[in-house]
Amino acid sequence: MSDISDANKLKHRFRGYFPVVIDVETAGFNSQTDALLEIAVTLLKMDDEGLLGIDKTLHFNIEPFEGANLEPEALAFNGIDPTNPLRGAVSEKEAFLEIFKAVKKAQKASDCHRSIIVAHNAAFDHGFVSKAIERCDLKRSPFHPFATFDTATLAGLAIGHTVLAKACIMAGIPFDNKEAHSALYDTERTAELFCYIVNRWKHLGGWPLLAAGESEDTDGEE
């Protein structure tokens, strides 16, 4: 029983990694030249039964960094006006200092040793996050430098669809296309999808795995 209870702790679920769901809205596809305009970060928690759920979400509108490229097509797609004062935008550095603080606190509370980005088509979000951290010359990032959990891949395996909206609907998660392409909305739907996949795998008997000690005993008996 103690082995099962221990396996239900978040620190043991992903090899000591604390999953942090992130979505960004940008002014293009090039993380080196195009502006990061919006970011939302959803922190997760695990209950005593080992089920993953949403804890809280942070959200920031971001000021384009100096010299940033703003692709008109990208702005038309996400509907963001970077010059609108009502956005209440903050600098990349201010946003990431707050994100680091919240992530490290949650990571420590879960007794995890590092955080790992969860995102839909994660290479895109990870690239923009990593470049912004580099631009701000921030040290001791809580995030793994290259490993991620990509919900597009996970959804393709678990649900049979890779598009966020359709994967959510197939998983029974409401999705409003009118709200899509807002970092806040997309992050929370991505978090719900990730939790659904992880929890479904558990319900199907995929976790926890047979304890190493039990496996060794079985091998010895054979």
Curated annotation (Swiss-Prot):
The active site is at H181. SUPFAM superfamilies: Ribonuclease H-like. Mg(2+) 2 binds at D23, E25, H181, D186. Keywords: Exonuclease, Hydrolase, Magnesium, Metal-binding, Nuclease, tRNA processing. GO terms for biological process: DNA replication proofreading; tRNA processing. Residues 20-194 form the Exonuclease domain. The keyword tRNA processing applies. Pfam families: RNase_T. Its cofactor is Mg(2+). Trims short 3' overhangs of a variety of RNA species, leaving a one or two nucleotide 3' overhang. Responsible for the end-turnover of tRNA: specifically removes the terminal AMP residue from uncharged tRNA (tRNA-C-C-A). Also appears to be involved in tRNA biosynthesis. PANTHER family: DNA POLYMERASE III SUBUNIT EPSILON (PTHR30231), RIBONUCLEASE T (PTHR30231:SF2). NCBIfam families: RNaseT. This is Ribonuclease T. It comes from Shewanella sp. (strain MR-4). The gene is rnt.
